[in-house]
Amino acid sequence: MCLTRSDVYAYVRETINKRKHEVDVSNVLAHIFEFDFQEHVEYIRANIDKALITVGGEQPYCKRLSYHIKRINKIFNLITSLETEYKAAVSKYDGDKHHYERSN
C-alpha cells in the first residue's frame, strides 16, 4: 500500500504527542526545516518497527511504516532551495541526450 506525505505528517504529529506524554520535550516544537527536527527523525527511526497507521473506511487496515523507510527518509530530506531542487531534478536525466535536447 502506498504511503502518502499526509500519512507521514500524521505520524509525526503522533510522535510529537507521544514524546510530550513521555515528558521528552527536547526540541518538540522544532519545524521540519529546522536542524533540531532531527530529534524527531531519530525517535521515528528508533521506533519505526512498531509504527502503524490505521486507515479508515468500511474496511480499516494498517500500514506498516517500516516498509516505507526510503520514502520517509526522502520526505524528511526535502530540498528547500529552488536551485538545489532544479539541479537534483536535472541530475536524474544525466546521460539522457533526448531529454537534454528537449529542455534546451
Curated annotation (Swiss-Prot):
Q: Which UniProt keywords apply?
A: Transcription, Transcription regulation
Q: Which Pfam families match?
A: Baculo_LEF-11
Q: Report which gene this protein is encoded by.
A: LEF-11
Record's protein name: Late expression factor 11
Please describe what this protein does. Answer: Involved in late/very late gene activation.
List where the protein spans the membrane. none
| Family named by the database record | Belongs to the baculoviridae LEF-11 family.
Q: Name one GO biological process term.
A: regulation of DNA-templated transcription
Q: Say yes or no: keyword Ribosomal protein present.
A: no
Which InterPro entries does the record cross-reference, listed alphabetically?
Baculo_LEF-11
